Regions:
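Non-heme Fe(II) oxygenase metal-center motifs and adjacent flexible, charged/small-residue loops
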Residues: 1-128
Length: 128
């Protein structure tokens, strides 16, 4: 499979066929049933317009104290496991033995906005 390289990103056009896309979508819906979407609070007050969830050991969370990775959904339960179809994509595209620790899920409705940004306090910029 040949990737299209654009501004440092590898684009794998047609990597997932229709059936595989539907499997991923159903897997994500299963995660969201267990860990419903929430709108994070920002440090200056107010809430983000994007709705979020996660799977894996950690999920992204933000409140007035700032943002961070946490081991539990805001409702108190651990994040669900990363679904097998998503782990399979990781395996196929990375070829790494290292396993992903989290899978962030963002839902943007028609009114949601998130500007281009980089989280500058990440421990390792080599990993997605």
């Amino acid at each position: 499979m040949t990737a299209l390289r654009l501004r440092g990103f590898d684009i794998h056009k047609e990597f997932l066929g229709r059936v595989a896309q539907q499997e991923v979508l159903e897997a994500v819906r299963g995660v969201v049933r267990q860990a419903p979407f929430f709108r994070p609070e920002v440090p200056r007050g107010g809430r983000m317009s994007v709705r979020m969830s996660a799977a894996g050991r950690y999920g992204w969370f933000s409140d007035r104290r700032g943002y961070r990775y946490v081991t539990e959904h805001p409702e108190g339960q651990p994040w669900p496991e990363i679904p097998a179809p998503i782990v399979a994509i990781w395996d196929q595209l990375t070829g790494l033995e290292r396993r992903p620790e989290c899978c962030l899920i963002n839902y943007y409705d028609a009114d949601a906005r998130m500007g281009l940004h980089q989280d500058r306090d990440e421990a390792d910029f080599q990993w997605p």
